[in-house]
Amino acid sequence: STLDVVQFNHYNTQENLWHVALWFDFLRTLKEHPMWNTETATCWNGSTEITQSVKPEGFCRVNSWMPIALGGEANMYWLWRTHWAGHELMHGAVLDASGRPMHTAGEVKQIAADYEKAADFINGTRVKSEVAMHFTARNWRIMDTQHVVKSLNYMDTLNDSFYKPLIDCGVRPDVIDAKQPLDAYKLIVSPLMMTIQEGDLPARIMQWVKDGGTWIAG
């Protein structure tokens, strides 16, 4: 089957917004384009209850630019306008149910103007990296179902101990699945991999190393 579009939604807060970057760096590698962020929160979330509150000024701007800066091609606000009845009545939005702008509307308007100014650069460039970090669903499942290391949370450790240190060093990695091609990379980091038996990775990475690639595994 053909994958038509890669899309992502999140409701991270200012405290953990940086966690989302790993997902954008991963989703970007799945398909050349398009990759869309289809639920960008302007403020709080809310289904049957509100579990977040008003975000600080500037949060919406950062949250809106992240998917675009990291390779996305669309950024859609959820909600654009609050419901007049039914589910998620308390969800944050750009406009309220009557159509009046909510407190973040001015920030959204400025973001749209900034997108327009940067349109030629955004449309004319792609996010490329010579460094990759492996992340696979199989290894995630193994770590979650067979606790090889007591109390180790796979995603938190991957983010805090491997991904973030790369970012802090000024390295912008592609986050790749085991089946992804390796040719574009000079350095590949494969953390927390309980198995590499996916996508013929052992043979492919051995050849890649013989061809001059540097592999950090552990």
Please report, for each region that a protein language model flagged, where it lies by residue.
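Carbohydrate-binding surfaces of carbohydrate-active enzymes
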Residues: 4-218
